[in-house]
Amino acid sequence: MENNRVNHFLFELVSPEKPVFSEQVVSVVLPSASGALTVMANHAPLVASIVLGSMYVLTSSGEKLFAVCGGVANITSSGCSVLVERVVVVQHLSFHDLEQRILRVRATLEGDSNDGISHKIEDFFHQLKVGDAGLTEA
């Protein structure tokens, strides 16, 4: 008899202000310092640095998308906890809110001589544009 049961694990996403998401999930794709990192049930233990980017969470009921900025992930065989400096639930972000956030960040970057940070933020904007199908119009 074939086992078609999907293995789930506990995923927790926490910001400095509050817990953002805690649920049994199928998989999570994290933006780590070494590239995209896919976490599934029974993953080998790992601690990873989280960078500016998009975090995809696959649940039994669908996909959730978060925009995150900096943090750390603690991955065990039974779960994954991610503490991030900043997080936005992309499904709850209106187009107007996104435009305003982009304008504020771009204004802050004007005159910034740190090319590394500028490139990371440009990459992040590109990722948000690619993932804008999940954004909700206000």
Swiss-Prot record:
One term under GO cellular component: proton-transporting ATP synthase complex
Any Pfam family hit: ATP-synt_DE_N
InterPro entries: ATP_synth_F1_dsu/esu, ATP_synth_F1_dsu/esu_N, ATPsynth_dsu/esu_N
Gene Ontology molecular function terms on file: ATP binding; proton-transporting ATP synthase activity, rotational mechanism
Entry keyword annotation includes Membrane: yes
Keyword field: ATP synthesis, Cell inner membrane, Cell membrane, CF(1), Hydrogen ion transport, Ion transport, Membrane, Transport
Localization, UniProt: Cell inner membrane
Membrane disposition: Peripheral membrane protein
Cystine pairs: none
Entry similarity comment: Belongs to the ATPase epsilon chain family.
Subunit structure: F-type ATPases have 2 components, CF(1) - the catalytic core - and CF(0) - the membrane proton channel. CF(1) has five subunits: alpha(3), beta(3), gamma(1), delta(1), epsilon(1). CF(0) has three main subunits: a, b and c.
Function of the protein: Produces ATP from ADP in the presence of a proton gradient across the membrane.
HAMAP family (UniProt xref): ATP_synth_epsil_bac
Name of protein: ATP synthase epsilon chain
Upper taxonomic lineage: Bacteria, Pseudomonadati, Pseudomonadota, Alphaproteobacteria, Hyphomicrobiales
Protein's gene: atpC
